[in-house]
Amino acid sequence: MKITRLELTMIRPRWMFLQMHTDRDLIGYGEPILEGQAPAVAEAVKMMEEYLIGKDPRRIEHHWQALYRGGFYRGGPILTSALSGIEQAMWDLLGKSLETPVYQLLGGAVRERVKVYAHVGGDTTEELCTRSKALATQGFSVLKTSFAPPVAYLENQAFVESCTERFATLRNVVGPEVDLAIDFHGRFSPAMSKRMIRALEPYYPFFIEEPCLPGNTDALVELRNSTTVPLATGERLFTKWGFRDLIQRQAVAILQPDLCHAGGIGEVKKIAAMAEACDLAVAPHNPLGP
């Protein structure tokens, strides 16, 4: 089997899908996308297409290494997101050629049920609570929310109390049986994040995501040492090399590699194995395609 061409389809507001065509009339599907940067990722895919034409898509690891290592500048959000979608399409073709689901090729199913969470927001606390109650009624046992306003390097007492009151009200509405996580989106400085987490601790956050920018491992370690709340990060990190320091230093409790950004299916599986060796949890990230 040989790759004959790559075809990209963009769908607003932020989806992009790859079709990898072959000489056997099999098509592999992938999702090479980076939020807000779809045209740039598309150009990266077209650049990689030149290498892929005429190659056997079933040599997934070989092509991944060739595409990643072949350039002087490696990695980063654009190139690795393009490579992620290409790698997904190659896995899809391998599974289709063997008439075997990809999860079987990866070692088979290990569980029958997986806990998922719903992201919930609202312009007002009342709206947030109403939506959260509805999701809990649907059966979601974990919800995640965030603080919408822009955050200065240091915020005043009123800001901290407002955010805390909103989360406390939500906790009282859904009760202790529903876990509540918070996404800081890396908007908080390490100093402000430490203060904010301390204020939220009495309301038992399930985890806090991106308490500061993900590349600041020193700050994450300091935050980890200052709280009992589990910390999470990883959606803006790329490849096993990007996660290595974070894992070795056990800077967070939960890693969130994104299947469309971190390098694809096989690369995320490697990251998960590295995390397992350090007793860290993995929650694969992907809020993209349908």
Language model: regions and residue ranges:
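Structured beta-strand/loop patches that form or line metal/cofactor-binding pockets in enzymes
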Residues: 1-29, 33
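Conserved, mostly hydrophobic/aromatic
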Residues: 3, 25, 48, 86, ...
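Metal- or metallocofactor-binding catalytic centers and their adjacent structured scaffolds
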Residues: 21-98
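Active-site flanking residues adjacent to catalytic metal/cofactor-binding acidic residues
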Residues: 30, 182-184, 209, 234, ...
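Shared catalytic-loop signature of beta/alpha-barrel
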Residues: 43-48, 62, 198, 204-207, ...
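Glycine-rich, aromatic-flanked loop segments that form ligand/cofactor-binding clefts
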Residues: 87-123, 127
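A generic structural signal for well-ordered alpha-helical segments
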Residues: 94-95, 174, 224, 275
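Metal-dependent enolase-superfamily TIM-barrel catalytic cores that perform enediolate-based chemistry
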Residues: 113-226
